């Protein structure tokens, strides 16, 4: 039964069906050549360009807009610095470089991008009166990869609605974004501070684009999801947004807390050939690292790994022990969240069925990697989920791989449990903990809602991750294929197809959040129903919106006990 709170969403399905795609035959043709769009902001004037949405109507794009000085040279491993204004028109018709990265989560990747990368894109519908709500979307990528590229995050589906403005920022990644000596020499959190700068830019300038600075929704996926939760807890971001959406990631995940940041920085120095790295003061260490070629720094991430790409999440947020006016976070996020010491805005949390495929699908698709992992089961398998305590290792073996030997855990029969283990440990536990601790607060004043994306379509991120067509189910980041046009990954959806309806419904759900704060059932301590997006057998309504009850409490308790042994 669809309750009153879901009536608007359910209506979206009906509306989409009844529209029947009449608009497609109504392809918008320009009667005349339009002058390119131009908008003046506090820093100067921007010359943008027009693109067409999926219905052929023009929308404005302002690409590669600077929000901070290039973090190069002496600005490497420093907090972002306000960019200088310019005279004349700034050419915002082309995308700038992605931040320097080696995406070692995917096979056969090389170093991409550059250090001069602190730019954002702004998209707005043409000839729509404002002020419009703003969606500020933070990309994922384990804090080591990703960009705001139109090829990955095409805005067309949001522009089709003609109801919101979309902002997509870039931020420093990996060693460039998160190197920390845990003191004044390099406090860290540069990637999060870059996002903060982009949020401040949005507050100062979005009204010039017809956006409403009082209705900014910050949304993110994976590492972007964790970033959203971090921003809710940082005192620096108060008042910069009005709603928040986290998809498939949490700031409470073990991977934020299982690395000695200073030891990692010294190890980083060693692998790029800095002599006596363990003996240098932190100031000397950072100065030496500033002199290393950026390409060499980015490439060296492979030398920091234990097995294949693991641990993936080495470069992470830091509790800043050196506190000044620029400090992003000086208290442990786990303490802040549990105590309710965060910005109380309407909050939506999302998760998918097979989140763990992000790490497991590549291994399961590669027999050589699988054999290597199995040969070192006791060391490598617990590493993936941050389990180092001997009792934790035993718990994993007993729960997921009971039929394996003590030396080789994996068998053909229990291989699916590898993905299940990663899904539960890396993703579900911390996401559910985020939700449980939030609704348990007696002082809580802001609403929370949870959605579960469980829709199977013809395309999947696992195809892009593994370069195969192996079926790993509904995997980490699959929902992005419906929110954004992915010209670099999948073809446009056929109008009227089930995937077309799914994309429209999910985008409208996000737009509803941008306008109203919450678009699904409320999650409370007494009752937490998840809004499920899934397939329907009804050809006239190919997307079903269902309500499912709560979470697997036994699973959550298992991981709670396991991570308590690690003191996460």
What does each model-found stretch correspond to?
Residues 3, 17-192, 213, 487-506, ...:
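Non-catalytic accessory segments of hydrolases
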Residues 172, 219-223, 451-459, 521-534:
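Short, solvent-exposed turn/loop segments enriched in Gly/Ser/Thr/Pro and often Arg
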Residues 60, 114-118, 193-196, 200, ...:
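A structural signal for well-ordered alpha-helical segments within the folded catalytic domains
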């Amino acid at each position: 039964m669809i309750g009153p709170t879901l009536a608007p969403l359910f209506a979206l399905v009906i509306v989409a069906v009844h529209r029947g795609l009449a608009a497609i035959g109504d392809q918008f043709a320009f009667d005349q050549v339009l002058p390119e769009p131009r908008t003046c902001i506090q820093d100067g004037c921007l010359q943008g360009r027009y693109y067409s949405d999926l219905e052929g109507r023009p929308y404005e794009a302002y690409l590669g807009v600077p929000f901070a000085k290039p973090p190069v040279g002496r600005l490497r491993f420093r907090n972002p610095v306000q960019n200088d204004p310019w005279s004349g028109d700034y050419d915002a018709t082309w995308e700038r470089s992605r931040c320097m990265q080696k995406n070692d989560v995917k096979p056969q990747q090389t170093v991409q991008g550059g250090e001069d990368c602190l730019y954002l894109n702004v998209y707005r519908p043409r000839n729509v009166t404002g002020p419009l709500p703003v969606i500020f979307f933070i990309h994922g990528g384990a804090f080591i990869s990703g960009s705001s590229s139109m090829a990955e995050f095409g805005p067309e589906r949001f522009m089709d609605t003609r109801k919101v403005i979309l902002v997509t920022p870039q931020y420093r990644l990996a060693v460039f974004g998160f190197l920390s000596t845990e003191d004044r020499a390099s406090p860290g959190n540069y990637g999060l501070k870059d996002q903060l700068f982009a949020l401040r830019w949005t507050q100062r300038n979005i009204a010039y684009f017809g956006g409403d600075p009082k209705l900014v929704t910050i949304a993110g996926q994976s590492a972007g999801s964790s970033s959203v939760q971090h921003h809710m807890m940082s005192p620096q971001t108060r008042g910069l947004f009005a709603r928040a959406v986290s998809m498939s990631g949490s700031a409470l995940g073990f991977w934020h807390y299982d690395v000695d940041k200073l030891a990692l920085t010294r190890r980083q120095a060693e692998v790029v050939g800095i002599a006596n790295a363990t003996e240098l003061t932190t100031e000397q260490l950072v100065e030496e690292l500033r002199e290393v070629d950026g390409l060499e720094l980015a490439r060296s991430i492979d030398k920091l790994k234990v097995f294949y790409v693991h641990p993936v999440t080495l470069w992470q947020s830091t509790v800043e022990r050196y506190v000044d006016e620029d400090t992003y976070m000086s208290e442990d996020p786990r303490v802040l969240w549990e105590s309710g010491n965060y910005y109380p805005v309407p909050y939506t949390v999302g998760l998918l069925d097979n989140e763990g495929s992000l790490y497991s699908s590549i291994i399961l698709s590669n027999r050589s990697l699988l054999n290597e992992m199995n040969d070192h089961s006791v060391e490598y398998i617990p590493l993936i989920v941050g389990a180092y305590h001997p009792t934790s290792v035993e718990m994993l073996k007993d729960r997921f791989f009971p039929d394996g030997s003590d030396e080789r855990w994996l068998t053909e029969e229990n291989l699916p449990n590898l993905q299940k283990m990663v899904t539960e440990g890396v993703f579900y536990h911390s996401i559910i903990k985020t939700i449980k601790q939030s609704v348990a607060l007696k002082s809580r004043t802001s609403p929370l809602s949870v959605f579960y994306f469980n829709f199977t379509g013809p395309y999947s991120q696992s195809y892009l991750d593994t370069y195969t067509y192996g079926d790993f189910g509904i995997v980490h980041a699959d929902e992005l294929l419906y929110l954004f046009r992915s010209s670099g990954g999948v073809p446009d959806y056929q109008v009227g197809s089930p995937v077309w309806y799914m994309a429209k419904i999910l985008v409208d759900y996000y737009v509803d959040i941008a306008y109203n704060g919450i678009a699904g059932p409320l999650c409370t301590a007494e009752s937490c129903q998840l809004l499920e997006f899934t397939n329907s057998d009804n050809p006239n309504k190919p997307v079903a919106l269902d309500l499912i009850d709560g979470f697997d409490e036994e699973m959550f308790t298992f991981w709670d006990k396991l991570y308590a042994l690690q003191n996460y």
